[in-house]
Amino acid sequence: EAKIAEMILAMVDGADELDVVANITAIKNGDWMAIADEINHIMPIVRSKGKKIKVIIESGVLTNEEIIKCCDIYGIAGIDYLKTSTGYAEKGATIEAVQLFKKHLPSNVQIKASGGIRDYAFANALLAAGATRLGCSASVAIVTGAPATGNY
């Protein structure tokens, strides 16, 4: 309910795209009904306002099987983007996770790779693996070839 309240406030404030962090505890516990129930409550609200939704699953802490199950559930729910990471987990975007997303998501669901993207080569590899959008705090360094600073 807190997620829905925050989403409504964000839309009232003018947000066109919403980032929603998946319930990682439910995923790790295999409580797939809770995951499906949550997204199925969120989607009608988002769609009724014509907004886009990105679901973040922290792929760096999930098994391949958990990632695939998330792709199945969120893909069927009709999300716009599946996103690899918030940037707070120890492990961010990986080529392997993006490839799993690409293989198991419906073609209409886009992939946002985020977390730990520090240089052009890695950014390009993520795009080649199937990412359609990148979330990078080192964007200037990536496009200019300069060394990235900071840890995100």
Locations of regions flagged by a protein language model:
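Catalytic cores of alpha/beta
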Residues: 1-9, 62-73, 100-103, 107, ...
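Glycine-rich anion/phosphate-binding loops
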Residues: 1-9, 29-38
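Glycine-rich phosphate-binding active-site loops on the catalytic face of alpha/beta enzymes
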Residues: 12-27, 76-91, 115-122, 127-152
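Generic secondary-structure microfeatures
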Residues: 22, 57-61
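Active-site glycine- and acidic-residue-rich loops that bind
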Residues: 28-31, 60-64
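Alpha-helix-loop-beta-strand connector modules within alpha/beta enzyme cores
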Residues: 32-54, 72, 76-77, 92-119
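A contiguous pocket-lining binding segment that forms or flanks enzyme active sites
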Residues: 52-58, 67, 81-83
